[in-house]
């Protein structure tokens, strides 16, 4: 049962890292390879192919585990503000481990905000109560258009690299844990050297293992493992 597998992997990770902040953990499968297999679920890869084609590189994963009380807010942002991908094409899968409700801080998004494929201006936040330190500058003008993504355990949503999205703090008394997996078309290039400039801005490493999970690499990426053989 996949939901049991997800929970088992999460509980093991939380136990092993109980003295660390696990509300936001980047580079997840580099830290714990147990999380790599979930990115290759056939039902997920099939949906990713419909969006970015047959040649696919898995390049990142994160854990978002909001505590039952005082679970941190994720500020409104675009994922592309953080990522050294050229050309900038990527899709994120948000895989739910816990039930996601309106009360426990669901992912929210602005419909259609990705369509012009442009990065909007972001500000840097100086706060310990958020998972990320970048936020969209003029988001207050359109927040009333936001929609919430409500999920049962094992369900997943997908969003584009340019989509405006974020999530509220969790004070519901009910944990909200989920995994994100990042995929890019293998026609794009992950610029490990260029990532260092962004790292200084966001405060965490963007050095990633790249996994070819479908098709062929077309942009001379530094592939860590080829899963198509």
Question: What are these language model-derived features?
Answer:
Residues 31, 59, 89, 103-105, ...:
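Residues that flank catalytic or metal-binding motifs in active/ligand-binding sites
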Residues 78, 131-143, 173-175, 193-201:
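Short, surface-exposed loop/helix-turn segments at secondary-structure junctions
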Residues 14, 156, 162-229:
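Non-heme Fe(II)/2-oxoglutarate
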Residues 1-85, 122, 194, 208-212:
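Non-heme Fe(II)-dependent double-stranded beta-helix
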Residues 102-168:
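Double-stranded beta-helix
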């Amino acid at each position: 049962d996949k939901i049991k597998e997800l929970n088992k992997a999460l509980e093991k990770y939380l136990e092993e890292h109980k003295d660390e902040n696990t509300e936001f953990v980047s580079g997840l499968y580099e830290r714990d390879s147990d999380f790599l297999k979930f990115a290759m679920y056939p039902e997920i890869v099939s949906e990713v192919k419909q969006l970015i084609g047959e040649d696919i590189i898995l390049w990142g994963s994160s854990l978002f585990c909001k505590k039952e009380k005082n679970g941190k807010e994720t500020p409104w942002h675009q994922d592309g503000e953080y990522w050294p991908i050229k050309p900038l094409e990527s899709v994120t899968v948000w895989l739910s481990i816990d039930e996601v409700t309106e009360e426990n801080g669901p992912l929210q998004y602005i419909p259609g905000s990705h369509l012009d494929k442009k990065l909007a201006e972001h500000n840097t936040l100086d706060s310990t109560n958020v998972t990320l330190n970048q936020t969209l500058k003029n988001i207050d003008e359109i927040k009333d258009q936001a929609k919430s993504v409500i999920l049962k355990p094992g369900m997943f949503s997908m969003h584009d690299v340019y989509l405006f999205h974020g999530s509220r703090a969790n004070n519901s008394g009910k944990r909200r844990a989920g995994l994100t997996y990042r995929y890019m078309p293998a026609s794009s290039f992950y610029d490990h050297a260029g990532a260092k400039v962004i790292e200084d801005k966001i405060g965490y490493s963007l050095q990633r293992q790249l996994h070819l999970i479908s098709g062929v690499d077309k942009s001379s990426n530094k592939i860590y493992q080829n899963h198509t053989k």
